[in-house]
């Protein structure tokens, strides 16, 4: 490893604990807000009481990442889904879940069935996957709230 890479790695590791705590706190606050939203059928966040796996999480963990999902009550068609996902200010559509930025993606039940045909699909709406980054949590909630207004 060259000196620059070692320096950047060392610098990043010094703040890792603070960043992970912030991911946990912010993602839990967003999950709690989503759990109360009338357009949300279910929130899948391990630190959220009532979520599948919460007892396991409570027994074995003290924090969580910023990655979780929720299910919309409505199954969005392709046009509605594109309108929903394409107009966020703070959330980007991407698969790079390990960074500091907030991300959003969607999966329809039929897409998941193609990947995991042996499992049962436990929802009829639209599954939205989130990674909650280090942006202000109230700004993230406001951005999600504006997204719900686009769902007719």
Region spans (language model):
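PLP-dependent enzyme catalytic core of the Aspartate aminotransferase-like
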Residues: 74-76, 102-152
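Active-site C-terminal subdomain of aminotransferase-like
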Residues: 1-67, 71-76, 80-106
């Amino acid at each position: 490893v060259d000196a620059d890479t070692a320096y950047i790695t060392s610098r990043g590791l010094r703040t890792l604990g603070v960043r992970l705590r912030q991911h946990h706190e912010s993602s839990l606050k967003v999950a709690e807000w989503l759990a109360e939203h009338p357009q949300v059928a279910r929130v899948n966040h391990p630190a959220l009481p009532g979520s599948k796996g919460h007892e396991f999480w409570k027994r074995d963990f003290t924090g969580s990442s910023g990655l979780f999902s929720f299910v919309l009550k409505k199954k969005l068609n392709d046009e509605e889904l594109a309108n929903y996902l394409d107009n966020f200010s703070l959330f980007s559509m991407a698969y790079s879940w390990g960074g500091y930025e907030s991300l959003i993606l969607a999966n329809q039940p039929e897409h998941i069935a193609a990947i995991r045909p042996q499992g049962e699909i436990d929802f009829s709406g639209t599954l939205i996957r989130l990674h909650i980054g280090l942006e202000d949590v109230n700004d993230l909630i406001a951005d999600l709230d504006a997204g719900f207004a686009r769902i007719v």
